């Protein structure tokens, strides 16, 4: 009897404590969330075009929305004001990236620049890349390389135009972008360059692939069953072999008397210099070079492709752009970069392309390392944060006729690539903003100017501006799903 009374009192005590705890415990005020499934969270609501899916959800749940991908909380920011608060007020607290399984496997444990954790190593590597590859002064020094490679592209298109057959414009622009990045980074075109297009697309597919280990760590064994682990090992080995080969190729060139003045040479010198505070391993060198290739080739090429697609879809805008380019260049036998500075409509067309088709529509995710307060909501530590610039840059509250291609909106507007109002931020902002912005824009403007100056362009078959396929393909970055094929008509003919 006494035992029963003690047990009853104990249970009453526990129940009272539980009730009081429930009553007085303070749950953090989290942002609104769509209903989620047990374990899965909100995965089932995403689809293949994530930026479009979260835009639909945000219309219902608000511009600050918390999703759950398995165990991972993901904050989606879909308004100009909140994006500004996130990237300005909380820039330091969100200076890290989520370290995914694929990024670790393919980028030497995230010792590149894009994914490296915020800290001294990241700061020094970013500074080295900016000073020796991505600064305005260095970009201007690559002028002759851009002009030479654009001339090569024009000669090849001219040769093909004589047959009257369609030209794969997508492929032409990709190889211009690829040749440019290799020449500016390495000083030469590597022998195995032809392999890289497939390697880079495989990389993007793998980084964007679903990984159990990232979202359901207890089910990491499933990555072996799905084949992801095997693909990551294969992709890592192929990328490593590729970068190793070009490093050895460059070392041999320097031994034969070539001046070691390129970005790769600087990285190798830093690797060999034991007096440096930041010690670079050979794997670190490979990670940084690979990161430079992956960000500096595919993404500018994609913007060039979207720009040509939009101009072809909008013949009146194409006419204005071509007239401007041809008036500025005149009867010279080449387009030079001094000309491009005067092409205000062309520059505005590139901005308008980036407004409608940002290469990273959700930017690249950041991660909170501490709890932060955004609009009176608590964002817990280790939350992934994605800025939905695809929606912000199409928000009808910010842009008149937001879905239309209207380059004139940027003419004399004062809106540049570092918009202080955050309505136009295709390259992000703050510490994790894209350091290669100026390099990429210079390449895009120059390539498109050359295509418009030297050729008129016709659709293939019965394709019209209204029927041109503009379907998107989202694999970590935003690409056009179907390559562009147009018929070039050389002005010289």
Swiss-Prot record:
Per UniProt, its applied use is: Combinatorially expression of Sinopodophyllum hexandrum (mayapple) genes of the podophyllotoxin pathway (e.g. DIR, PLR, SDH, CYP719A23, OMT3, CYP71CU1, OMT1, 2-ODD, CYP71BE54 and CYP82D61) in Nicotiana benthamiana (tobacco) results in the production of the chemotherapeutic compound etoposide.
* Listed Pfam families: p450
Q: What is its EC number?
A: 1.14.14.131
Q: Which GO terms describe its biological process?
A: phenylpropanoid biosynthetic process; response to wounding
User: Single GO cellular component annotation?
Assistant: membrane
Q: Which UniProt keywords apply?
A: Heme, Iron, Membrane, Metal-binding, Monooxygenase, Oxidoreductase, Transmembrane, Transmembrane helix
Q: Which residues cross the membrane?
A: 1-21
**Membrane topology according to the record:** Single-pass membrane protein
Catalytic activity annotation: (-)-bursehernin + reduced [NADPH--hemoprotein reductase] + O2 = (-)-5'-demethylyatein + oxidized [NADPH--hemoprotein reductase] + H2O + H(+)
- Cite a single GO MF annotation: heme binding
**What SUPFAM superfamilies has UniProt attached to this entry?**
Cytochrome P450
Positions with a binding annotation for heme: 434
Describe which pathway this protein belongs to, using the record's wording.
Answer: Aromatic compound metabolism; phenylpropanoid biosynthesis
- Provide the cofactor list for this protein: heme
User: What drives induction of this protein's expression?
Assistant: Transiently induced after wounding.
Q: Where in the cell is it found?
A: Membrane
UniProt record similarity statement: Belongs to the cytochrome P450 family.
- Protein purpose: Cytochrome P450 involved in the biosynthesis of etoposide, a chemotherapeutic compound of the topoisomerase inhibitor family. Catalyzes the conversion of bursehernin to demethylyatein.
Name of the protein in its database record: Desmethylyatein synthase
